[in-house]
Amino acid sequence: MKNYFSCLFLASCFMACSEPQNLKGNVSFSEAEEEVKMSEIITDYSLIKLETKGKNLILDVSMMRIWDDRIYILDAFASDKTVWVFDMEGKHIGRLGAFGQGPGEYIMPRALMVDEANDRILVKDVARNRLLFYDAEPLECVKEMDIPFYSDCVESLGENKLIWYVGSGCANQGDFQKHIQITDMNLNVLNNFISRMDFPRRGLYNVMSYFHRYDDDIYFHHPFSDEIYVYDAENDTVVNEYTVSFEDSKF
């Protein structure tokens, strides 16, 4: 677990820089308990049956967001790739945009985020490297913006900020090669972290996002790395929080 006293002391001693602070602990799978009860990690749950019929059948729940009593589901692998919208009872409300190249449309949607401050839903179109902004009510596109760099995934930080993960294979130049880019909602770069790393192993993997939200924190890691990072919003920096140890375990 985190050592809060160490974190606070070190945070006061260092200025934010382009390389992550190293405060990591070790997460060992060999020391993990063999059995974890679901009741210990899930305390509140419900079953919602989605109204899927006719033209709103879902092939794949690629990504899901729940905001303001609505459920947004990105189906990135259907023939007519789209974002479906349901209420909390499962009733079908509509869709965000549509597959195509016209205004408010996308070709390869690969990210779905909520901009809580402005009550908007954001969709990243990988094919055109563009970010689309939709009003939650009504479900209309209000603007589209070209992204100034290539990235693997993106997540909202709140406070009108976005965090982007730039993979080693992205054809960027200069500071855009750094793995973490922080931008505002107008896609102006505010900061960047972690110099480019070439991972020794290659392969195909279907991961929609490297970002994971826990409470108010954003954690991230690459599938081929044993390092887990967290974005420290208060100090606007990246912290190397954990190292995952499989020891003698094999995949």
Question: Where in this protein do the model-derived segments appear?
Answer:
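Short loop/turn segments that connect beta-strands within beta-propeller blades
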Residues: D87-E89, D135-L139, D184-N186, D232-N235
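A short helix->beta-strand "capping" segment at the edge of beta-propeller domains
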Residues: E33-I58
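Short coil/turn segments at the loop-to-beta-strand junctions that recur within blades
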Residues: G54, G97-G104, D146-D152, R196-R201, ...
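C-terminal motif of bacterial Sec signal peptides marking the signal peptidase cleavage site
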Residues: M15-A16
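Blade-loop segments of beta-propeller domains
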Residues: T52-K55, K91-N118
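Asp-box/WD-like beta-propeller blade repeats and closely related beta-sheet repeat scaffolds
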Residues: V126-L132, A136-A171, F193-D198
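Residue-level detector of Asp-centered blade-edge/turn motifs that repeat once per structural unit
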Residues: I66-D68, V114-N118, S156-E159, R213-Y214
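Repeated scaffold domains used in trafficking and secretory/extracellular systems
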Residues: D60-M63, I107-A111, F149-S156, R202-S209
